[in-house]
Amino acid sequence: ITMPSFTYASPAQRIGKLKGEILKHAAPQEVLGITGLQKSIPKNNSKTVSMRRYRPYGALATDENTKNRWVVDAAAHVLTEGVAPTADTLVPDNIEATLSQYGCLYQVSDVVDDTYEEDVPAEMKKQCGERVALIREMVRYGVLQAGTNIFYSGGTTRATVDEAFTLNVARKVSRVLQANSARRITGVLSPSVNIGTTPVEAAYLVFCHTDCEADIRSLSGFVHVSEYGTRKPVNENEIGSCENFRFITSPHLAPYTDSGAATGVTGLYSSGTKVDVYPYIICGEEAWG
């Protein structure tokens, strides 16, 4: 039998040196997980999850907007005495997802565990948890970035974006959300092992990179969290609100670097010759899962 082998480098000991305390390191920040539809999957079941949604009456299969939009003509529903109305049928849409398994591995020898002055295994376990949390956040971000309901600031494609986020763009998104009966979020998931919700004031939540904070603060009518009074932030990373939006920032919601219009005289940040495009994830109640 061939035994598996591996090599690894242990952290160097601080022999012959004054041993200071173990300093804190930057911890990942999860923000997208406070919303969305999250379900626990029972053990020993299929890897494929199939959700079903019945379309509202009259909804068209053109795109995700029309699939969830009612089309009802009152005149077509007038009844005639003695005549049974024509029966309608429900039209389902199945949304499927395949489960994926994620993990990470650190290695430590018994010598390190027995002789090192600090608890290396405990630090490894801590970093495993933090790393998996960031993986989970990146999976969510990838799913949301793949959405097809997209609005562009100062352009019609990502490659033509040449303006910062504006209130006009936010209002366009708001109109579409409301036209599709998207409910404002009134509860966010609590940060605990049990899936529960905490009530919040109704609003559409906006998630974006921390680089976007200056643009958000420049919006007309922006209210900083320090001015909320009795109103509670939805998350420690919430920076404020404007009209029916509440803004949450995170350093992990990375931009599409060097992918917009030519920087030119736009004054926008770029890591190359083109504008860096920052996604703003705007969502209503149960908009994703």
Question: Where do the protein language model's features map onto the residues?
Answer:
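Oligomerization/assembly interface segments of phage tail-like spikes and tubes
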Residues: V49-M51, Q101-V108, K126-Q127
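Short loop/turn segments at secondary-structure transitions that flank enzyme active sites
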Residues: Y57, G103, V112, L134, ...
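Alpha-helical scaffold segments that mediate packing/assembly in large oligomeric complexes
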Residues: V112-S192
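Sequence/fold signature of self-assembling virion shell proteins
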Residues: T2-L32, T160-I185, D211-G289
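Extracellular structured ligand-interaction cores
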Residues: G103, E201-A203, N244
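Short acidic, glycine/tyrosine-flanked loop/strand segments centered on an H-E-D-like triad
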Residues: D88-Y116
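N-terminal "assembly arms/tails" that initiate or stabilize quaternary assembly
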Residues: I1-A97
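Short, low-complexity, charged/polar segments at coil/turn and helix-coil boundaries
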Residues: A27-T66, A164-V223
